[in-house]
Amino acid sequence: MARHVVLLRGINIGSRNRVAMPALRDALEEASFTDVQTYLQSGNIVVESRAKPETVRKKVEQLIEQRFGLEIAVVVRTRAELAAVVKRNPHAKVATNPKAYQVTFLEQKLSAKTVRELEQAAAGAERVVVSGREVYAWHPQTIARSKLWAKLAGKDLGVTATSRNWTTVEALVELAGGLGAFLAAGDLVPPPPPRSRAPSASASRTLAG
């Protein structure tokens, strides 16, 4: 059976959208998912299923609504896709603090207009790379006051999206089987050409293809 990484958007933030992980694990197992594991309280789940990723997404969304009465958006990646996200790592040379390095997982690719808006929002030493259905964003100063982060965390992207810091991304790869197994098996999917926004001498940012 295939292993999937299931990412929930916006749960357990303060008193809003509360979902207990033990109860969620039980519900997923009752729904015929196997080897169900969770990481932290922010909605990071690894499951095994014969279903395709899109079917897994719909099934988890429906289950959460039925069991917990919440409409929660879900993004799913196969374990090979998530391992490819880590292997790609376009900010490896500059992102020294994993808590300030965010990956935004998208249900679908962004429009060219939205990509340009993200690139224009990167300020100072911030960097952003859009690669397929992921956005890699490095916020070296502060995430809280970042216009780039505000765009990524908001609802103006035009697609379902949810973000995780680099520590969580790497932990989920390990939980799903580890990067070494994928490299040995040649199981990684080829990365799409990235579009990036990085600082330049003239305007603090430059577009790198």
What is each PLM-predicted segment?
Residues 2-209:
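Surface-exposed, charge/polar-rich loops and edge strands
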